[in-house]
């Protein structure tokens, strides 16, 4: 069969248009597929805890977390989370680099300045649950949070790269995972205003410290698997108070939580009734 030049050109043009339409159709199909649940309500693509964890250099994570803290003012939760998942995205691509990282900005100031959980701790702990379920994450969070309660921080020092205040900062153990207590105690003991650059710098460095520790925990978890255990014992106050207040069947079993009891219930000057005869 003889094919003329005109027929050949028309045929190629038709193939090109057809191929483009097929490509458009596949893009639309993918978009439609992404808009739908994996198989039904509450399911997700890849399954729960379906992402693969990768080892990271804790020192690199710390620096990225510190820089992330200052990035657009997104703060501690963003910096800590990005230092793990964002770095995996930079090194390994999808799905890590597809996460909407800016949503972690909500954790700034203990979640929109409410002073609840330290945003750096939340950002770091949230990364664990991308890879492992509750039972496996529990000892990982215990390790991170109990470390934070008892360790004198900040350890990280950015040197001349400091974005708030250069030089050493006072170090202390917060005894609490709550932003309100951690910040207030440090500011009170060191006579530093909570709205100061020094306080912001401390939080930036704490973000780096939390990221460093979280990366260490993830690396160890990858090596040890289900054998991973927290190296920190239960706090003495939780063990003692829990005998009554966290024991099933006890009339006083109305307390929930395993954070250190003493910062809120020790009866110190800071925990007395401040609404009576307050100046």
From Swiss-Prot:
Needed cofactors: heme c; [2Fe-2S] cluster
InterPro entries: CGCAxxGCC_motif, Multihaem_cyt_sf, TAT_signal
Signal peptide positions on this chain: 1-32
UniProt keyword annotation of Membrane present: no
A matching Pfam family: C_GCAxxG_C_C
Cited SUPFAM superfamilies: Multiheme cytochromes
Keywords attached to this entry: 2Fe-2S, Electron transport, Heme, Iron, Iron-sulfur, Metal-binding, Signal, Sulfate respiration, Transport
Entries under NCBIfam families matching the protein: SptSoretCytCDesul
The protein, known as: Split-Soret cytochrome c
